[in-house]
Amino acid sequence: MNMRPPKPVALAALIGFALGAPLAASAQVVPLKEAKLNIEHNATVNDTGYQGAIDSEGWGGLTVTGPDGVILELKPQGKLATLGMTELFFETVEPENAKVPVADMLAILPEGKYKIEGPVVASLGGGTTAGTAWLTHNIPAGAVLITPAEGAKVPLGDTVMSWGAVTQTITGKPVKIIAYELIIEKVGDPDPNMIGKPNSLSMHVRPSVNEITISAAFFEAGSPYAWEILAVEESGNQTLASGKFSTE
């Protein structure tokens, strides 16, 4: 007959079962809804930086760890910290390639998996929230903007926005584009209170789409507009090309 005492884990499980205690609740691991780390390159002004996007039910702090160790720590403080944070989007400074070459920017973070994890706020049961971001150094080339032509004055009406397909990286290697993002904004000061820009639109389209017509209802007569096409490759890295036009 085995008379040795139960191992600590087994003993804890027995006590938890006897008392009806939900021991697993304190050790819950809640997957992040979103865990992304990408590169954004601007092919028009030639600068490059990193971006991240995180979404969860609620976290009290986060640590981002990659192949070379910790690259970022986030810790909310103050009155709102007790509520916990959910969504977060961040961008690094994007130095000009002439000052910091792309190769030097890529050397900051190696390719690979980046673990994003931290505590779940107590009000949501505690535990840990975690996810993994995938970073590559595949940077798409910029799309060629076709219409409207740069600096064109277009009639007020339905307007065709078109661009060339992107098939290579900035180093000439084949690239898999998974989407294009079209952004159009009326040039002007941002609203002092509204999050987001008034008189603007943003949409993602399939990689097979290189042309879309925007309704005349979006545009105002005699107004300047800026537009961008972002080519997004399969790991999430994106390159933007931008232009300007105006309406009659």
Language-model-derived ranges and their functions:
Residues 105-111, 217-223:
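Surface-exposed, short loops/turns at beta-strand junctions within beta-sandwich domains
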Residues 12-21:
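Bacterial N-terminal signal peptides
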Residues 69-100, 177-220, 234:
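Recognizes extended acidic, P/S/T-rich segments that occur
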Residues 127-129, 232-248:
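Extracellular fibronectin type III
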Residues 154-174:
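Conserved aromatic anchor
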Residues 130-144:
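Proline/serine/threonine-rich low-complexity linkers at boundaries of modular beta-sandwich domains
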Residues 118-120, 229-231:
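Conserved structural position at the C-terminal beta-strand
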Residues 44-50, 157-161:
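Structural beta-strand segments of beta-rich domains
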